[in-house]
């Protein structure tokens, strides 16, 4: 997650985007211009790669990509009517609005990268290999911690000259080391 993106950076991006890309619907351009013209709204706008899990979102497409031209949703209500979206954005200016933009070379655009944020609601999907690596790391950490604790107890047994405890702990340590191999 990157540091907070300033209002000016978001406004500059919207202006750049509208100058560089032609929207599939002119209403999408109007909505973006309206947002850019109101700092109090821009403050609550977040540009994300997908709208999964977001309570309120706007998906807009420029020419050159295969995506719906205009989608707005709030909760379980979804609409392609820009006027309803505009009305909601205007009235609920202080609610978080997640915006997903579809345009050519979006993922390689440095301008978009500057304002793009991680979707805080998107489920994190780990590949099987990543899960196995995480499990191995956890196992190794627990094993290392247990071994260090056991070595401390062995040192204490030596310091107190407790031969029975010392031998018992050494056997546990040897068994632990054998199991790890």
From Swiss-Prot:
It comes from the Bacteria. HAMAP family: UPF0302. Belongs to the UPF0302 family. This is UPF0302 protein lin2035.
């Amino acid at each position: 997650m990157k540091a907070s993106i300033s209002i000016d950076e978001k406004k500059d991006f919207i202006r750049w985007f509208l100058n560089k890309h032609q929207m599939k619907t002119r209403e999408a351009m109007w909505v973006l211009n309206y947002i850019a013209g109101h700092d109090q709204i821009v403050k609550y706008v977040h540009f994300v790669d997908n709208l999964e899990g977001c309570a309120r979102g706007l998906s807009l497409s420029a020419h050159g990509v295969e995506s719906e031209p205009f989608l707005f949703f709030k909760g379980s209500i979804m609409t392609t009517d820009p006027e309803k979206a505009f009305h909601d954005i205007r009235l609920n200016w202080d609610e978080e609005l997640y915006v997903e933009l579809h345009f050519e070379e979006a993922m390689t655009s440095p301008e978009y990268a500057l304002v793009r944020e991680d979707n805080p609601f998107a489920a994190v999907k780990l590949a099987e290999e990543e899960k196995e690596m995480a499990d191995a790391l956890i196992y190794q950490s627990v094993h290392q911690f247990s071994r260090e604790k056991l070595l401390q107890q062995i040192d204490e047994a030596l310091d107190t000259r407790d031969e029975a405890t010392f031998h018992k702990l050494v056997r546990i340590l040897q068994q632990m080391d054998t199991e790890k191999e």
